[in-house]
């Protein structure tokens, strides 16, 4: 599977996940608006006053 990952030029870098990594995630700090994207072995969706995290299981589904 491939997911987007944050790198030097922003969050558009495409990476190939390892065999154990079954999820793409998108994590955002609602206060600072910082975000991180990448691959994960496990993923828990979260939407609180501070953090938003979404998980998905198809290629490049975390833009």
Swiss-Prot record:
Pfam families assigned to the protein according to its UniProt record, in alphabetical order: Toxin_TOLIP
Coiled-coil intervals: none
Positions carrying Proline amide: 63
InterPro entries for this protein: Snake_toxin-like_sf (IPR045860), Toxin/TOLIP (IPR035076)
Location in or out of the cell: Secreted
Residue pairs linked by disulfide bridges in the UniProt entry: 3-24, 6-11, 17-39, 43-55, 56-61
Tissues showing expression: Expressed by the venom gland.
Record PTM: Contains 5 disulfide bonds.
GO cellular component: extracellular region
Keywords recorded for this protein, A-Z: Amidation, Disulfide bond, Neurotoxin, Presynaptic neurotoxin, Secreted, Toxin
GO molecular-function term, one example from the UniProt record: toxin activity
Function in brief: Unknown. In vitro, this toxin activates sperm motility when tested on OF1 male mice.
Similarity-based family: Belongs to the three-finger toxin family. Ancestral subfamily. Orphan group XIX sub-subfamily.
Name of the protein in its database record: Actiflagelin
Annotated organism of origin: Walterinnesia aegyptia
């Amino acid at each position: 599977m491939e997911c987007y990952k944050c790198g030097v030029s922003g969050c558009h870098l495409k990476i190939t996940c390892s065999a154990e990594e079954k999820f793409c995630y998108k994590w955002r700090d609602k206060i600072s608006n910082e975000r991180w994207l990448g691959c994960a072995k496990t993923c828990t969706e979260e939407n609180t006053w501070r953090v938003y995290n979404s998980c998905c299981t198809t290629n490049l589904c975390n833009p």
